[in-house]
Amino acid sequence: MREAEVFRETRETKIKLYINLDGSGNYEVNTPVGFLTHMLESFAKHGRFDLKVEAEGDVHVSHHHTVEDCGIVLGQAVLKALGDKKGIRRYGYSIIPMDEALVLSSIDISGRPLFFYEDKDLRGKITEFDFELIWEFFKGFALESRSTLHIKVLDGKILHHVAEACFKSFAITLKEAVKVEGSGVPSTKGVI
């Protein structure tokens, strides 16, 4: 079973995360940021990952540290769960709607940590959550999972819908990339 648990503690956050890449979408997520909790639950459900998250953070300062660090820890856990990466598809992509929002995402589990996004200059809050923090989450994930991740907002006006489409698209994209399709490392170099 491809699963991993990661614990990370800093002066700003304390996060324990478990993921099973071959799960069925079960989740137990507890963070001090309600919208982040909702997005992580959506990620687990639509990617069919089993996910447990216990997070504490200095939300009296900002949601930034907690959101970014959850992305970092998720990236570390996925990297650990993938092990030697033998047999994985490596690439994944999806285009997902959420009402008026439409989001494209693509990933290459390449060993080259990069993150690119286009957000149509959308700014604002979803309740108390700064929309722009989703990009910090995805950047943390991409860097720590050593993946190249692209997320492009193709359309959308309601920030909640755009953010949710991003997380659902990301989940489906990642699920596609971690699928086991063969036996060797999917690279002409022989390593990722």
UniProtKB/Swiss-Prot annotation:
**Which reactions are catalysed by this chain?**
D-erythro-1-(imidazol-4-yl)glycerol 3-phosphate = 3-(imidazol-4-yl)-2-oxopropyl phosphate + H2O
Q: In which pathway does it act?
A: Amino-acid biosynthesis; L-histidine biosynthesis; L-histidine from 5-phospho-alpha-D-ribose 1-diphosphate: step 6/9
Give a yes or no for keyword Membrane in this entry: no
This entry's Gene Ontology molecular function terms read: imidazoleglycerol-phosphate dehydratase activity
Q: Where in the cell is it found?
A: Cytoplasm
Q: What is its main location?
A: cytoplasm
Assigned keywords, A-Z: Amino-acid biosynthesis, Cytoplasm, Histidine biosynthesis, Lyase
Check the record and name the InterPro entries matching this protein: IGPD_sf, ImidazoleglycerolP_deHydtase, ImidazoleglycerP_deHydtase_CS, Ribosomal_Su5_D2-typ_SF
Q: What class of enzyme is it?
A: lyase
Claim: Lyase is one of the keywords in the record: yes
GO process terms (BP): L-histidine biosynthetic process
| Top-level taxon in the UniProt lineage | Bacteria
What PROSITE patterns does its record include? IGP_DEHYDRATASE_2 (PS00955)
EC number of the protein: 4.2.1.19
Recorded GO cellular component terms are:
cytoplasm
Which Gene3D superfamilies has this protein been placed in?
Imidazole glycerol phosphate dehydratase, domain 1
Q: Which family does it belong to?
A: Belongs to the imidazoleglycerol-phosphate dehydratase family.
User: What protein am I looking at?
Assistant: Imidazoleglycerol-phosphate dehydratase
Provide the species name: Aquifex aeolicus (strain VF5)
Q: Which gene encodes it?
A: hisB
